Regions:
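N-terminal, Lys/Arg- and Ser/Thr-rich interaction peptides
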Residues: 1-23
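A broad, low-specificity signal marking well-ordered, structured residues that form hydrophobic/aromatic
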Residues: 2, 44, 51, 81, ...
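N-terminal compositionally biased, intrinsically disordered segments and leader/signal-like regions
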Residues: 4-6, 46, 104
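Short, polar loop/linker segments at the starts of domains and inter-domain junctions
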Residues: 17-22, 69, 131-134
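N-terminal post-signal-peptidase region of extra-cytosolic proteins
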Residues: 21-34
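Extended, low-complexity, intrinsically disordered C-terminal regulatory tails
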Residues: 31-68
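Catalytic cores and adjacent binding grooves of peptidoglycan-active enzymes
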Residues: 71-72, 76-134
Length: 134
């Protein structure tokens, strides 16, 4: 299970002035929905691999230093999470189960753009597509 501590990655202590109540609220929703996704995945696949947060909340300096990060990344607002997925199994399962993403209220960055992790967010992208290209 992913916790808010996992999601903040110590950045809540390093950058307290950037962490607003809105970001905290968004982060709580993001973590809750990510845990629902992982619970569904584990229940249906019996995969027990421990999934860690590759990237959670990103303050501006962290986002600017993150390779290939969008200048207005949803991570900066607590609206997105990258979950470790070294073999791509979680991404593949998400691609095969868009109905579960929809039920939970998550949007998936296309796996071809996120090798080694699964990026999900709690708000739709500009395209509105459940699976999107950044």
């Amino acid at each position: 299970m992913i916790t808010l501590t996992d999601y903040f990655m110590g950045r809540d202590k390093q950058y307290p002035d950037e962490l607003t109540e809105e970001i905290r609220s968004n982060a709580a929703e993001t973590v809750a929905k990510a845990n629902l996704l992982l619970s569904s995945y584990r229940m249906l696949t019996k995969d027990e691999e421990i999934r860690k947060v590759n990237s959670g909340w990103r303050p501006a300096l962290i986002n600017a230093a993150t390779p290939n990060a969008a200048p207005r990344s949803k991570h900066m607002l607590g609206l997105a999470i990258d979950i470790s997925d070294p073999e791509g199994d979680l991404d593949e399962w998400c691609m095969d189960n868009p109905d579960i993403l929809q039920t939970i209220g998550l949007w998936l960055e296309h796996p071809s753009c996120s090798k080694g992790w699964t990026h999900v967010q709690i708000v739709p992208p500009k395209s509105g597509k459940r699976v999107f290209y950044p």
